[in-house]
UniProtKB/Swiss-Prot annotation:
Phylogenetic classification of the source organism: Bacteria, Pseudomonadati, Pseudomonadota, Gammaproteobacteria, Enterobacterales
Domain of life: Bacteria
Protein name, as recorded: Amylovoran biosynthesis glycosyltransferase AmsK
MF-aspect GO terms: glycosyltransferase activity
InterPro entries: Glyco_trans_1
Pathway: Glycan metabolism; exopolysaccharide biosynthesis
Organism: Erwinia amylovora
Group of enzyme by EC: transferase
Length: 407
């Protein structure tokens, strides 16, 4: 089967779920290609990108996007003008039908820039807004094949995305062969938005448990080692985590908190660390490849990710980073946010605080640091949860069966 992954950018270091799906389907013998609208971060990339020679399998529809609205439009216009009379290019200017992706010249630029159609048995598209674009490209004969769209988080929660695609999504629901939300929460939301229930199948983003060695920690380090692995964005709740650490320090807690990742909030988080007098115990260490992240997980005592709904409505799906921590036997502390309670049951397979509640987080961390919780049954239950319900092998086998039936 010819399976083509379609994304807005590739590779993206934080989107390991896309990379892992790509390499899995290569491993089981599929003819795999990747189409990305723009090149991703080719500097901060994971080893699998090179190991599988994915650069040779990836087609970029447009060059690197320029910064700034005016520069973007000028770049796209320069691509469009030589092909302005091409029938598909003219049709792509139908703003009433194609919306913002037309008015911002994204769709016309793609149609103008690509001479031949891309054919596949199935286009597996990650994120709803990319699905909306791919669906239009099918209509304009740039893509030829069936389409399956995966909904993750921001694509179905962020207000400006929902507003921009309020006409696109109903058409996507009607014309796509299948919609794959990653949580039951998003399944219910898709149905509420008008998607036929029979077109929906929940597909989990999972991990490969055998690649994560379960380690039962006999004793906690002193100082306590707390770890987060996340993009530095609002919905990851890292500002709340830092505030919880400030409270924990005031209560006499002795700890080292390491945050792996990069993003737009780096300067803001550094300020929060300095303002909280936490520079001696909270460190931002930037991007780390997957192999090095495993070492950090192995050496930590607690994994912390108190996700929350951002001011613009942006929400998580179910963070893979939590699954990885659960697989290695790290006690996980998170929040009652989005699909996370589908992964973590409070006091059973981890600990959950209300969204944005730094006091509650600090109380959980203090309780764990003082040995007041029986951790071993919880981490064993967490490992069992990811092995059975968030196991990449099971999830991808089920996905392959779905795609085979569809093709």
């Amino acid at each position: 089967m010819k399976l083509t992954f379609f994304t807005m950018q590739f590779p993206v270091s934080s989107e390991t779920f896309v990379l892992n799906q790509v390499t899995h389907f290569i491993d089981i013998g599929y003819d795999v290609e990747i189409i990305a609208v723009f090149p991703g971060d080719l500097v901060n990339r994971h080893a699998a990108f090179d190991r599988y020679n994915l650069a040779a399998k990836t087609h970029y529809l447009l060059p690197d996007d320029k910064d700034g609205k005016t520069a973007k439009l000028a770049q796209r216009l320069a691509i469009i003008l030589p092909k302005i009379l091409k029938p598909g290019t003219l049709k792509s200017f139908h703003i009433g039908r194609y919306g913002a992706q037309s008015s911002k010249l994204l769709l016309p630029a793609i149609v103008a820039a690509n001479k031949k159609p891309f054919a596949a048995d199935i286009f597996l598209v990650h994120f709803g807004y990319a699905g909306a674009l791919a669906n239009k490209l099918r209509e304009l004969k740039v893509l030829q094949g069936k389409q399956v769209t995966v909904f993750h988080g921001a694509d179905i929660s962020r207000r400006h995305i929902l507003e921009e695609h309020k006409k696109d999504y109903p058409r996507l629901f009607a014309q796509n062969e299948l919609l794959l939300p990653i949580s039951r929460l998003w399944q219910h939301k898709l149905i509420a938005m008008g998607c036929p229930a029979e077109k929906i199948n929940v597909t989990r983003m999972g991990i490969e448990p055998e690649k994560f060695n379960l380690k039962l920690r006999d004793a906690l380090h002193q100082p306590l080692r707390i770890l987060s692995v996340a993009r530095l964005t609002e919905k990851k709740g890292l500002g709340v985590a830092i505030e919880a650490c400030r409270i924990l320090k005031q209560q006499g807690g002795c700890f080292e908190y390491t945050i792996i990742g990069y993003g737009d909030l780096e300067a803001q988080l550094k300020t929060a660390i300095a303002d909280g007098d936490l520079e001696d115990c909270v460190k931002l260490v930037g991007f780390k490849p997957q192999e090095e992240i495993k070492r950090y997980l192995d050496e930590a005592d607690i994994f912390l990710l108190p996700s929350l709904t951002a001011a613009d409505g942006d929400m998580e799906g179910i963070p893979v980073a939590l699954m990885e921590a659960m697989a290695v036997g790290l006690p996980v502390v998170s929040s009652e946010h989005s699909g996370i309670p589908e992964l973590i049951e409070h006091n059973v397979s981890g600990w959950l605080a209300p969204e944005g509640d730094a006091q509650a987080l600090a109380a959980i961390l203090l309780r764990l640091s003082q040995g007041e919780a029986d951790v071993v049954p919880v981490v064993l239950a967490a490992r069992a949860k990811v092995e059975t319900e968030f196991n990449q092998h099971i999830a991808y086998r089920q996905l392959a069966e779905i795609l085979e039936r569809l093709a």
